[in-house]
Amino acid sequence: MQNDRKKHTRNFSIVAHIDHGKSTLADRLLEATGTLTQREMENQVLDKMELEKERGITIKSQAARLVYKRDDGEEYILNLIDTPGHVDFNYEVSRSLAACEGAILVVDATQGIQAQTLANCYLALDHDLEIVPVINKIDLPSARPDEVKEEIEDVIGIEAHDAPLVSAKTGLNIKDVLEAIVEKVPVPDGDEEAPLKALIFDSYYDSYKGVVCYVRIKDGVVKPGTKIKFMATNKEYEVTETGIFTPNFFPMKELRAGDVGYITASIKNLRDAGVGDTITEASRPAKEPLEGYRPAIPMVYSGIYPVDGAKYEELKEALEKLKLNDAALSYEPETSIALGFGFRCGFLGLLHMEIIQERIEREFNLDIITTAPSVIYNIYKRDGEMLKITNPTNMPDPTEIEKMEEPVVKASIITPSDFVGAVMELCQNKRGTFIDMEYIETTRVVVNYYIPLNEIIYDFFDMLKSKTKGYASLDYELNGYKQAKLVKLDMLLNGDVVDALSMIVPEERAYNKGRAIAEKLKEVIPRQMFEIPIQAAVGAKIIARETVKAMRKDVLAKCYGGDISRKRKLLEKQKEGKKRMRQIGSVEVPQEAFMSILKVD
């Protein structure tokens, strides 16, 4: 009976470029198999977060179990694992794929193959998954299914002549997709007699059950009461509940090899159940864990401060709660002279950073100031010490530094061939090194570049979109460190360094960047009763200056005619007063000032 059950099980995930209709297709599959009633049906069922629905993106992996009855009466259990499509969440995608045997590759019939289609598809091929191409949005007048089929065959090299042509929006031909899954996705392998091995492909914190681990059982059996051990952290727990997803939790008495489900074991800390870790039995552990586990490493750092200093504790609580559900978020307290107490937070990428900031503001109702994002630099000092720096204010004195290294990414950009020149110019301006380019078809090109990560984290994506009228798509992965000539650029207001505005920039750009930021600050800092010099400095050398003029009262209004010396006396008196004010006056830096710097090119 058990083997029979395994024969009728299929584990698959859906991969696609952003906006090619992945979550909508998942909705239709849930609907077609009757997993959810009409009443429970809503758009993007698997995207549970408000933000996910609003932005139309998938952030966390989710899972659902579909029961599909074929026309011959046979019942199949299809486990769908929904994956995020954005490049920041690449690791989550790779863990979700490791839990499957097959992947549906959704391609938009109007747009064809895009950068993330390729990136996610190669990820799936790395995991030896069977790929089932599905062409979506064929109800649109601009759909060109035959060309897209050829493109899939030429570029990715998988057969697509019999790919289902569907419209996830209208529900057209959804049954073909279910048939293709049953036909093409392999039966899960795994030995129920062997020691337990379960891959965690996602985990989240539930305030009643503790940490809930989403798992794919590779070998063995797990049931409530089993003593389990996490192989990366060596922590041991007793299982309290096992079950499956009908998107909502449904307890079962056990999970066997080949199943996808969840395990709870009164775990208090998400860190103990890292995504990608292997669960095994404490009394009969597996010899080695499943491969591919790596702790989530933040790539981008930024300071987050409460606008109202008294709300520091609330911000700390908010970050603690978000951390429960997001193992990739890291934070530590820091203080800034300009902004008071706050936290230095690490993120997977820019989208991840935006989402966390937005969730703090929305879910916890806090006003926050965020500083310019920065990456991790390696600094080698003359005394042989090596420092990793995420905050420009911690950079040692330039005289102590032997050399500095910055992280570099390998970026693949797919663009219509008309815009190749503009894309290459953008990459060169961002200190990119050309690798190669190849034509996918006569009208589209893949361009590969090595680009320093700190050039990408500001506005690279926006500029790429505007230079290509929104047609280009980008995918990048970290590619190690390389030596660079970098300096710390400080901004001074009224002679004081504003630490939150400091940044690390390439030496040859320091002057232009300093000048541009000074001009920008001049626009956003409100005028005071005394004049404020805004200076950009590298070390002790001032490289640019702007002045915010003082507001002044017309002290000569009451002199009609009269002697010049009388007027001079009044003006001198005013000047003295302004000078005194300037010595004791402090400058408030508005939130816009921090944000405007990000947009300076």
Curated annotation (Swiss-Prot):
Its main location: membrane. It catalyses: GTP + H2O = GDP + phosphate + H(+). GO terms for biological process: positive regulation of translation. InterPro entries: EF-4 (IPR006297), EFG_III/V (IPR035647), EFG_V-like (IPR000640), EFTu-like_2 (IPR004161), G_TR_CS (IPR031157), LepA_C_sf (IPR038363), LepA_CTD (IPR013842), LepA_IV (IPR035654). Keywords: Cell membrane, GTP-binding, Hydrolase, Membrane, Nucleotide-binding, Protein biosynthesis. GTP binds at D19, H20, G21, K22, S23, T24, N136, K137, I138, D139. One of its GO terms (cellular component) is plasma membrane. The gene is lepA. Residues 7-189 form the tr-type G domain. It is an enzyme of class 3 (hydrolase). It holds the Pfam family LepA_C. This is Elongation factor 4. Belongs to the TRAFAC class translation factor GTPase superfamily. Classic translation factor GTPase family. LepA subfamily. CDD domains: EF4_II, EF4_III, LepA, lepA_C. It is a peripheral membrane protein. Required for accurate and efficient protein synthesis under certain stress conditions. May act as a fidelity factor of the translation reaction, by catalyzing a one-codon backward translocation of tRNAs on improperly translocated ribosomes. Back-translocation proceeds from a post-translocation (POST) complex to a pre-translocation (PRE) complex, thus giving elongation factor G a second chance to translocate the tRNAs correctly. Binds to ribosomes in a GTP-dependent manner. GO terms for molecular function: GTP binding; GTPase activity; ribosome binding; translation elongation factor activity. It is found in: Cell membrane. SUPFAM superfamilies: EF-G C-terminal domain-like (SSF54980), P-loop containing nucleoside triphosphate hydrolases (SSF52540), Translation proteins (SSF50447). Its EC number is 3.6.5.n1.
